[in-house]
Amino acid sequence: MTDRPQTPLLDQIASPADLKRLSDAQLEQVAHELRQETISAVSVTGGHLGAGLGVVELTVALHSVFDTPKDKVIWDVSHQCYPHKILTGRRDRIRTLRMKDGLSGFTKRSESAFDPFGAAHSSTSISAALGFSVARDLGGVTEEGLGDAIAVIGDGAMSAGMAFEAMNNAGHLGKRLIVILNDNEMSIAPPVGALSSYLSRLYTEAPFHDLKAAAKGAVSLLPEPFREGAKRAKDMLKGMAMGGTLFESLGFSYIGPIDGHDMDQLLPVLRTVKARAAGPILIHAVTKKGKGYRPAEVARDKGHATAKFDMVTGEQKKAPSNAPSYTSVFGKTLTDLAAQDSKICAVTAAMPDGTGLNLMAERYPSRTFDVGIAEQHGVTFAAALAAGGMKPFCAMYSTFLQRGYDQVVHDVAIQRLPVRFAIDRAGLVGADGATHAGSFDIAFMANLPGMVVMAAADEAELKHMVATAAAYDAGPIAFRYPRGEGEGVEMPEQPEVLEIGKGRIIEEGSRVALLSFGTRLGEVRKAAEALAARGITPTVADARFAKPLDRDMILSLAEKHEALITIEEGAVGGFGSHVAQLLSEEAVFDTGLKFRSMVLPDTFIDQASPKDMYDSAAMNAEHIEAKVLDVLGVARLDERRLPAS
């Protein structure tokens, strides 16, 4: 289906100001049309569908009641922001979502005044909203002005400690601040579900008696699935020794639960809060992820992240796979190893599917732990599992491991505990852009004493590295691998345990050595082929380890070649810097060795395809070829420059 939906009312909305002249009934119609437009757009671009569909009515209500952009609506994670972008002057570009030079899939300050605070990681919204509230009261100035600050945060994000740190501070300061808890019951599952005991208590204190009266029947007004969710939470509250909810004990006035899809409930509550709130308020709205689009509602992940799809059937249009994904290779290999070793267990932070641990969880649920959005806790939990004699694999995206870095240092590395870090989404990741790039883990992991750091050049190497990590008990060990499909190499039947700190020579050559760390090896080999056509035959090597370095191999490469170039999918300070330190310590530079290190540039690279992103970073085969020609001084003058990115 290619026809766009008919949206006569939505067509009249150029900015949120246009919503204010509409009746409540018309706002409800706008919400209906906005939902259809969101589905249509994401069917073309792919992206986070379910989250946006769950907040359509809330988005319309917020922008119609509050005075954005003076009032700051801060979307936690912000993957639910597509309807928000449509209403805030970006509808004409909505079908460029997550594409090169298109709209970001998240809120972004540089994109619109209606995006006051960028996001993509979870649980930051309340801290940001509190900051805006304090800035307002201290006389801070922005171009749009400073009014109310409204944080919209999901139940999953509320499982992170940062959200409660912010609420604790907000309650102490007592500033006028509005938090909307978007409870779609998707993320608070039994393993991380203690918080769910607090998610339903009607507000009982002045000055909101009118709200209490309005909300008294709210549970009975909810659709059956929501009534059950509210009942579940209220039942769990009965045994509490102290009165009031957790939110009230933190200093927040609590309103709810209300049906987050019912404009007749949303609009009066928001209008009353806007008119009368004096301190921090939490509004508990119960919603349904994927609301209004049956294929998303019935999907296992409620349409959390989709490829392009057919609007009628919901069938996703995924390109045929030529090789297994790195994530699936990790998950399958770990599960197979767990069958042989009962001490192997796994920890992830709200990403069992994304990290491939769903395979392990299905077969060994008692040894697989989803700790929720709690990377700090997850790392320390894994550290103590290791101290207790288990073999924990802590599987996290590179970008999210950053959130638990102090624990990596303090609880794992200093104690030399054998935690195995499986670092997924290493390097540039494509459509999710800079916020999800795994650019820094080589540097921040390899700088830690006693940490072993590996990078897989292909899916077969990853299989070996999982086995190597399982066999290594002398201290912490990490291995990194990218998003997406492998290289299509032949997979070994059984993994091999690699010798720690030993790389491999792929192709013997002369004059220049290309030393790759990670999956740039494929591009290095393409560059070597192009160079061979010019009469230059480089040596190609796969380092495998950034720490400990293969000292013998690196010094041999330096001795036998006039130039040595390292290539890695990481920021400066990583593998190449460690190689340079070794060469410096051994006085190799004194002999005249020409050394270059190809790393990601010192900038944040916006979303595009991975190939386009690596082109922008000057890290693809033609750039490697140009670097060799330049360092050897054999390029013509017009070939000395790197290809335009």
From Swiss-Prot:
Molecular function terms, GO-annotated: 1-deoxy-D-xylulose-5-phosphate synthase activity; magnesium ion binding; thiamine pyrophosphate binding
| Co-factor binding details | Binds 1 Mg(2+) ion per subunit. Binds 1 thiamine pyrophosphate per subunit.
Pfam families per the UniProt record, alphabetical: DXP_synthase_N (PF13292), Transket_pyr (PF02779), Transketolase_C (PF02780)
Q: Which residues bind thiamine diphosphate?
A: 79, 120-122, 156-157, 184, 293, 375
Pathway listed: Metabolic intermediate biosynthesis; 1-deoxy-D-xylulose 5-phosphate biosynthesis; 1-deoxy-D-xylulose 5-phosphate from D-glyceraldehyde 3-phosphate and pyruvate: step 1/1
- What's an example GO BP annotation here? glyceraldehyde-3-phosphate metabolic process
Per its Swiss-Prot or TrEMBL entry, what cofactor is needed?
Mg(2+); thiamine diphosphate
Q: Binding residues for Mg(2+), per the UniProt record?
A: 155, 184
The coiled-coil segments of this chain are none
Q: Determine if Metal-binding is one of this entry's keywords.
A: yes
* InterPro entries attached to this UniProt entry: Dxylulose-5-P_synthase, THDP-binding, Transketo_C/PFOR_II, Transketolase-like_Pyr-bd, Transketolase_BS, Transketolase_C, Transketolase_CS
Q: Which reaction does it catalyse?
A: D-glyceraldehyde 3-phosphate + pyruvate + H(+) = 1-deoxy-D-xylulose 5-phosphate + CO2
UniProt keyword Membrane, yes or no: no
Could you tell me the keywords of this UniProt record?
A: Isoprene biosynthesis, Magnesium, Metal-binding, Thiamine biosynthesis, Thiamine pyrophosphate, Transferase
The UniProt record lists the EC number as: 2.2.1.7
Q: Which PROSITE patterns match?
A: TRANSKETOLASE_1, TRANSKETOLASE_2
Instruction: Report the HAMAP family cross-referenced here.
Output: DXP_synth
**How the protein assembles, per its UniProt entry?**
Homodimer.
Stated family? Belongs to the transketolase family. DXPS subfamily.
Q: Which PANTHER family match?
A: 1-D-DEOXYXYLULOSE 5-PHOSPHATE SYNTHASE-RELATED (PTHR43322), 1-DEOXY-D-XYLULOSE-5-PHOSPHATE SYNTHASE, CHLOROPLASTIC (PTHR43322:SF5)
Quote the function comment for this protein: Catalyzes the acyloin condensation reaction between C atoms 2 and 3 of pyruvate and glyceraldehyde 3-phosphate to yield 1-deoxy-D-xylulose-5-phosphate (DXP).
Q: What is this protein called?
A: 1-deoxy-D-xylulose-5-phosphate synthase
Which species expresses this protein natively? Answer: Ruegeria sp. (strain TM1040)
